[in-house]
Amino acid sequence: MNISKVLILETLYELLLNGQTNRVSLVRLQADVNDHPMTKQLAHQWQTLKINDILDVIKLLFPKQTSLSDGQIIFYNLQIVEIRDTLLDVVRECQDTLVKDVKQLEQQYQAIKSHDDMKIRRERIMGMYRDTILAKLQSFQHFHRLYSKLDPSPVVRDMMDLERIKATSIENLSHLQHILQKCVTDSVMTTKAGSDRYREIILSQGELDDTVKFVRYAMDN
């Protein structure tokens, strides 16, 4: 709306100033407004102003100082300098609005950027915890053999192996613990009870529990 005011006032000011008269053809005013260079620059987001749109703006800005006659708008008791001053006021109003809009957009951008930065830092930290836990588990006697490579089995769906775990983005420590616990559970499901591998699986559960406790302690301190 403010941009419309600027275009109409500027065009009106030039027509009255050049014509040295107190009346302006509405058709001429509409044509000049829609041919204004600023209108052409905003063509992709701008609707052509109709005569009624222009009249609404003029009546709003100069109530009780205009009348219509034979397709012309006539101004009463209105000095050309008043139109210029009104134009400058509207321009300042536009500038203030744009400044506020820009500041609001900057605040929104900073909020999004801060959120994204925090998300990236969190993902990086969680990745460090994941790699630390995997490295520690690989140093143990039993667990690393458990999840280094699991053979496919119809008993277990969506089996995990070491490379897949390394590539997983974890949300938190509990998420990683759930993934690693699934390795133990999958192995239990695919291993004969009482076998040597089964005993290794039981021992690996203790290794996993100790590692998770260690990392949780490190996070808290």
Swiss-Prot record:
<keyword id="KW-0805">Transcription regulation</keyword>
<keyword id="KW-0539">Nucleus</keyword>
<keyword id="KW-0156">Chromatin regulator</keyword>
<keyword id="KW-0234">DNA repair</keyword>
<keyword id="KW-0804">Transcription</keyword>
<comment type="similarity">
    <text>Belongs to the EAF5 family.</text>
</comment>
<dbReference type="GO" id="GO:0006281">
    <property type="term" value="P:DNA repair"/>
</dbReference>
<dbReference type="InterPro" id="IPR026226">
    <property type="entry name" value="EAF5"/>
</dbReference>
<comment type="function">
    <text>Component of the NuA4 histone acetyltransferase complex which is involved in transcriptional activation of selected genes principally by acetylation of nucleosomal histone H4 and H2A. The NuA4 complex is also involved in DNA repair.</text>
</comment>
<dbReference type="GO" id="GO:0005634">
    <property type="term" value="C:nucleus"/>
</dbReference>
<keyword id="KW-0227">DNA damage</keyword>
<comment type="subunit">
    <text>Component of the NuA4 histone acetyltransferase complex.</text>
</comment>
<dbReference type="GO" id="GO:0006325">
    <property type="term" value="P:chromatin organization"/>
</dbReference>
<protein>
    <recommendedName>
        <fullName>Chromatin modification-related protein EAF5</fullName>
    </recommendedName>
</protein>
